[in-house]
């Protein structure tokens, strides 16, 4: 059974209260609950991890290679400057899809650059929580199709 890691970075735990005009009112728990139901329908497993600490995210990326079929990564603002996360992603053989709830390219200029995107399989931005599902569907398609 395909098993994917949903990895969320700094401030994603503040969803629902942080800039709801940008990120919406769904909490991270709401999103995880919805994704859990989505995974059940596809007969796949998802594991969720969120940290506000760069090193914890790097450790999770390194450890993922032994446990998962791919990673959906929302690095938050770390996407703009974390060469350490970029290096962690490029050091593993798992496919990684970068996801952002908001459209980075419609926000402040400094958000228009991701140092992670060039080493990820792809990037999904601006589609809200639906972006996670699209990323999972892509990763699943790379496993030889949808389960069952």
From Swiss-Prot:
Q: Where does substrate bind?
A: 74, 80, 87, 101-102, 111
Q: Quote the catalytic residue positions.
A: 100
Q: Which domain of life is it from?
A: Bacteria
- InterPro entries hit by this protein: DHquinase_II, DHquinase_II_CS, DHquinase_II_sf
Tell me the pathway: Metabolic intermediate biosynthesis; chorismate biosynthesis; chorismate from D-erythrose 4-phosphate and phosphoenolpyruvate: step 3/7
Work out whether the entry's keyword set contains Lyase.
Answer: yes
Which keywords appear in this protein's UniProt record, sorted alphabetically? Amino-acid biosynthesis, Aromatic amino acid biosynthesis, Lyase
Give me the reactions it catalyses. 3-dehydroquinate = 3-dehydroshikimate + H2O
One GO BP annotation is: quinate catabolic process
E.C. number(s) listed in UniProt: 4.2.1.10
Record site: Transition state stabilizer: 18
Could you tell me one molecular function GO term of this UniProt entry? 3-dehydroquinate dehydratase activity
Q: How does it assemble?
A: Homododecamer.
Q: Which family does it belong to?
A: Belongs to the type-II 3-dehydroquinase family.
| Name of this protein | 3-dehydroquinate dehydratase
Provenance organism: Bacillus subtilis (strain 168)
């Amino acid at each position: 059974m395909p098993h994917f890691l949903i990895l969320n970075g700094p401030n994603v735990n503040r969803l629902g209260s942080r800039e709801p005009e940008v990120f919406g009112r769904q909490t991270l728990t709401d999103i995880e609950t919805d994704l859990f139901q989505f995974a059940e329908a596809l007969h796949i497993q998802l594991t969720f991890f969120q940290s506000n600490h760069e090193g914890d995210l790097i450790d999770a990326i390194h450890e993922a290679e032994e446990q998962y079929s791919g990673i959906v990564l929302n690095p938050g603002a770390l996407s703009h400057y974390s060469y350490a996360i970029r290096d962690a992603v490029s050091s593993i053989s798992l496919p990684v899809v970068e996801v952002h709830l908001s459209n980075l390219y419609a926000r402040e200029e400094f958000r228009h650059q991701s140092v992670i995107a060039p080493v990820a399989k792809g990037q999904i931005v601006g589609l809200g929580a639906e972006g996670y599902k699209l990323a999972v569907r892509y990763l699943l398609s790379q496993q030889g199709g949808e389960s069952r």
